[in-house]
Regions:
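Short amphipathic alpha-helix adjacent to the substrate-entry channel of hydrolases
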Residues: 102-120
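Short beta-strand element of the alpha/beta-hydrolase
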Residues: 86-96
Length: 157
């Protein structure tokens, strides 16, 4: 239960971070290179505005399975995860009303380029949190599956 609370806290922090982007320029869609035109004043924002050092890979881990709410779940992650024997931090992003992970893909890729495993789904109404819970269950299952690229790769601490 503590692990889920911690993961939900991370979700909330990332949601607030993403909200700052939408409030800054709500009239425009997120483009592939949104970080180039974003004018940041803070040192932290300037440091992380550009892409990170990791090449990003993307994988669909569940496609409309009933046990996971009939949503598609996708994961963006540092490609080095496939070959390095280490654990990586995971971020689960919940979409806003009528949005999906497909529409916000540049943000998912951006976070993955900084070394995060980033999970998203196609649930357009995440307010009740069911798809978040199902997504966490799915990632726990993949982290325990020897055949999965995510086997023992998710940092749960």
């Amino acid at each position: 239960m503590e692990k889920i609370k911690k993961q939900l806290q991370i979700i909330l922090y990332v949601w607030v971070w993403l909200l700052s982007f939408s409030m800054a320029d709500a009239a425009e869609a997120i483009t592939d290179e949104y970080w180039i035109t974003t004018a940041d004043r803070g040192k932290i924002e300037q440091r992380y505005r550009s892409l990170g050092i990791y090449e990003v890979a993307k994988k669909t881990v569940s496609r409309k399975e009933e046990q996971y709410g009939n949503y598609t779940y996708r994961v963006w992650y540092p490609k080095r995860l496939e070959t390095e024997n280490r654990k990586w931090p995971m971020v689960f992003l919940l979409n806003g009303t009528t949005s999906t992970c497909d529409l916000d893909e540049p943000i998912f890729e951006h976070l993955a380029s900084w070394g995060f495993i980033v999970v998203g789904n196609t649930d357009r109404n995440t307010g009740l949190g069911y798809s978040a819970e199902w997504g966490l269950e799915l990632m726990d299952k993949l982290a325990a599956d020897r055949k999965s690229v995510f086997f023992q790769k998710i940092d749960e601490e």
